[in-house]
Regions:
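Short, basic/aromatic recognition patches
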Residues: 18-25, 79-84
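Tandem CBS (Bateman) regulatory domains
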Residues: 1-10, 46-92, 100, 104-149
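Core beta-strand residues in small-molecule sensory/regulatory alpha/beta domains
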Residues: 38, 98-99
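Short, small/polar residue-rich loop motifs at catalytic or cofactor-binding pockets
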Residues: 29-32, 90-92
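Alpha-helical/coil-rich non-catalytic "connector" segments in signaling and regulatory proteins
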Residues: 3-4, 15-22, 31-34
Length: 152
């Protein structure tokens, strides 16, 4: 499963000329703390709710408070594990996705990524997890297979 498969279609990107009030309204509506800022299909920034709330003027432009340095993003072909790592390391609620040409194609919410990860791991399927603890020196795939098949 790749980043392109995880995109949440209902999260619109902000434009640099949007005001802070619109950004905060969208963050509240979509229950996210970050939103990408896109200009002519190019990712130009990322805004955080905390930065927006610190701004005294609700009619100020998003471009005045957006992060423009080291904007985190995922490539369309990146694996879901790489996307989850980005969420974890950067503390993001939304990850922008770019294609191979650097064109913005959408965003992934943390919630959507977690749902897809659970789907990938078959969390909803009935079954059980067996944990076998062995010394490293005693590790043998044949022994593990025999233990698993020998117990009903």
């Amino acid at each position: 499963m790749h980043a392109l498969d995880l995109i949440t279609p209902d999260i619109p990107p902000l434009r640099p000329h949007d005001d802070i009030k619109r950004a905060l309204d969208w963050m509240e509506e979509f229950k996210v703390m970050h939103l990408p800022v896109v200009n002519e299909k190019r990712l130009v920034g990322l805004v955080k709710d905390t930065d927006l709330m610190e701004c005294a003027d609700a009619h100020a432009l998003v471009s005045t408070v957006m992060e423009q340095v080291e904007i985190p993003f995922a490539r369309a072909g990146q694996h879901i594990y790489d996307v989850m790592k980005l969420f974890s390391e950067r503390g993001l609620s939304v990850v922008p996705v770019l294609d191979e040409m650097g064109v913005y194609v959408g965003s992934i919410t943390e919630h959507q990524a977690l749902l897809k990860l659970a789907e990938l791991a078959n969390v909803g399927e009935p079954g059980s997890i067996v944990i076998l603890e062995m010394n490293l020196i005693d590790y043998s795939l044949q022994l593990i297979s025999r233990i698993v098949e020998g117990n009903d």
